[in-house]
């Protein structure tokens, strides 16, 4: 029974890409930033080859012989956000970045949004999600106007107090925004950002919901589903692909939940892909420039990893990668244009095998399709033959 568990450590980049200057990300290295913290400890990832990848060998312990195949992944797409990164992993290289709005959204778009929702809009500028409710939360509660804001990413975010706008109503407003954000304003994601509490102590709740663009063409997920395989989505994977190609999904509130849900799926019988996103690295620590928090989150994942490895079946393959960077040590709170890691591990996978630097994240999707004997219609070149034991 063939199974692949593909785990995305959201934002765990491993060093600036050659074009990082075009994105104002020179010098970014998310993993090395976290490694400077006293709370950083990843012996299990190290055993799998994490520090033997291109660009990280100065961190390697020469006594450790990696038990897995490993590589450094280059992002071929233009952009550095979650949607673009996950789409590329699944076989779509995006020639254009998704639109961003550093000056806020155009008046015509917001006029239509106000007309359709019956509520006014406040803010309309790039903002930190925690700061925006501090600065606009009181006005929102008093007037009922929706806090609409963006970031350096391609997002249209709507913050609302759950006591003012019931959660289902907020989700409906997001669906309206998703309908009208198209063409030049076709953001990658519309995001519901509910919060609660009393002024000035507002806090975001865990009922965030993302409304993504449909992928422009079929991905690895669609091909696996068409071929009769299960495609299980853990965390925000279902949202990132707007449900396209997913056969079963479970939402999670944090990394701990994501790990537990993945372990539950590991115990179940299925044939196909379990695609996991662990978001805390990015959402809770990277964007908030919390180096120690980031290090603790990586250490926690590393602590839990043996639970998964010990329960792997004969035909299981584990792949660990990332979708972009988000260096918590730089002045920027935004994503960073970085290489990402790839670890491939399983009973059938060679140890101590370095695949070097791959041209595109899409090689991952191609390798997964080849493992399931599904002829690929996606971009990317499979590395499966290079890492399978003969």
Curated annotation (Swiss-Prot):
GO terms for cellular component: cytosol. It is found in: Cytoplasm. Binds 2 manganese ions. Its EC number is 5.4.2.7. It holds the Pfam family Metalloenzyme. GO terms for biological process: 2-deoxyribose 1-phosphate catabolic process; 5-phosphoribose 1-diphosphate biosynthetic process; metabolic compound salvage; nucleotide metabolic process. Mn(2+) 1 binds at residues 10, 323-324. Transmembrane segments: none annotated. HAMAP family: Phosphopentomut (MF_00740). This is Phosphopentomutase. It comes from Lachnoclostridium phytofermentans (strain ATCC 700394 / DSM 18823 / ISDg) (Clostridium phytofermentans). The lineage of its organism: Bacteria, Bacillati, Bacillota, Clostridia, Lachnospirales. The gene is deoB.
């Amino acid at each position: 029974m063939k199974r692949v568990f593909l785990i995305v450590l959201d934002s765990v980049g491993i060093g600036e890409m050659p074009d990082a200057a075009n994105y104002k990300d020179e010098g970014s290295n998310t993993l090395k930033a976290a490694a400077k913290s006293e709370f950083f400890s990843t012996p299990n990832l190290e055993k799998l080859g994490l520090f033997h990848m291109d660009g990280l060998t100065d961190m390697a312990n020469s006594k450790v012989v990696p038990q897995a195949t490993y590589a450094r992944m280059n992002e071929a797409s233009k952009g550095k956000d979650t949607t673009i990164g996950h789409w590329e992993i699944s076989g779509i290289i995006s020639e254009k970045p998704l639109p961003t709005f550093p000056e806020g959204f155009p008046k015509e778009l917001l006029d239509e949004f106000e007309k359709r929702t019956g509520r006014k809009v406040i803010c309309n500028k790039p903002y930190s999600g925690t700061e925006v409710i501090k600065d606009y939360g009181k006005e929102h509660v008093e007037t009922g106007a929706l806090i609409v804001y963006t970031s350096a990413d391609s997002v249209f975010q709507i913050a609302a107090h759950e006591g003012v706008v019931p959660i289902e109503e907020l989700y409906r407003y997001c669906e309206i925004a998703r309908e009208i954000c198209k063409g030049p304003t076709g953001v990658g994601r519309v995001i519901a950002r509910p919060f609660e509490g009393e002024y000035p102590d507002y806090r975001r709740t865990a009922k965030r919901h993302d409304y993504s663009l449909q992928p422009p063409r079929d991905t690895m997920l669609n091909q696996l589903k068409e071929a009769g395989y299960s495609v299980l989505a853990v965390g925000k994977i279902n949202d990132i692909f707007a449900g396209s190609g997913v056969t079963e999904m479970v939402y999670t509130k944090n990394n701990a939940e994501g790990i537990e849900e993945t372990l539950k799926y590991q115990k179940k019988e299925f044939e196909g892909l379990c695609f996991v996103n662990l978001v805390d690295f990015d959402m809770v620590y990277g964007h908030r420039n919390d180096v120690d928090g980031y290090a603790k989150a990586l250490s926690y994942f590393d602590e839990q990893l043996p639970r998964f490895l010990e329960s792997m079946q004969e035909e299981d393959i584990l792949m660990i990668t990332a979708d972009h960077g988000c260096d918590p040590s730089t002045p920027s709170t935004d994503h960073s244009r970085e290489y990402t890691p790839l670890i491939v591990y399983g009973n059938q996978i060679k140890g101590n095998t370095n695949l070097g630097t791959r041209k595109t994240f899409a090689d991952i999707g191609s390798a997964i399709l080849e493992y399931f004997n599904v002829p690929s219609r996606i971009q990317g070149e499979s590395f499966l033959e290079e890492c399978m034991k003969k």
